[in-house]
């Protein structure tokens, strides 16, 4: 019995340290529920709106978000799916409009947008698409009208337009071409008519 006593005491201590924890809104409705160990959230936690509807299903490890996280609108539709690692956004992520259509998708690296991201109109058509480096838009970007036709495209440097850009009407026909420098229009810009003929439009300093 003497040899087993330390094991018994340790077991009791562990049980006391790990416990289900429930928080409530001021109105008395449940706010969140999950497991805590030494006052740190661990495992699966559910969070709720004041209405009682589920707002999030989160996963913790030693008090930090870790793994797949899901968020919901008050009407119950899925709002977002994120991957966290050691309390930072990592890997793929998906966000949705309240009606259910995909709003945007892409990748995170240490809480910052990284790589290709795509954004969508509520009707499901692509809104814009481009690359990020350390959270900043760079490289070739395309923007689209709500009905799906290409609107404009060009290069971004540090989040600003740079070099040649092309603009299209809602039927997909080329409308304007010109250049940018650090987000400002420069040089001679051209305009295209319905027959596709180019003419000088405006000179920028």
Label the predicted regions:
Residues 16-205:
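Glycine/tyrosine- and acidic-biased, solvent-exposed loop/turn segments at the edges of beta-strands
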Residues 1-21:
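Bacterial Sec-dependent N-terminal signal peptides
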């Amino acid at each position: 019995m003497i040899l087993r006593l330390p094991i018994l005491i340790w077991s009791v201590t562990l049980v006391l340290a790990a416990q289900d924890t429930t928080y409530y809104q001021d109105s008395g409705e449940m706010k969140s529920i999950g497991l805590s160990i030494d006052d740190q959230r661990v495992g699966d936690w559910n969070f709720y709106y004041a209405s009682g509807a589920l707002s999030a299903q989160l996963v913790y490890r030693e008090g930090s978000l870790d793994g797949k996280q899901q968020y919901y609108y008050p009407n119950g539709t899925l709002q977002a799916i994120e991957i966290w690692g050691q309390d930072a956004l990592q890997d793929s992520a998906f966000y949705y409009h309240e009606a259910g259509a995909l709003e945007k998708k892409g990748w995170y690296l240490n809480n910052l947008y990284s790589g290709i991201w795509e954004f969508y109109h509520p009707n499901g058509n692509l809104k814009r698409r481009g690359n990020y480096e350390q959270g900043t838009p760079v490289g070739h970007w395309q923007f689209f009208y709500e009905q799906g036709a290409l609107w404009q495209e060009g290069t971004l440097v540090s989040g600003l337009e740079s070099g040649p850009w092309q603009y299209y009407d809602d039927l997909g026909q080329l409308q304007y071409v010109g250049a940018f420098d650090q987000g400002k229009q420069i040089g001679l810009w051209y305009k295209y008519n319905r027959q596709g003929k180019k003419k000088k439009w405006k000179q920028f300093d």
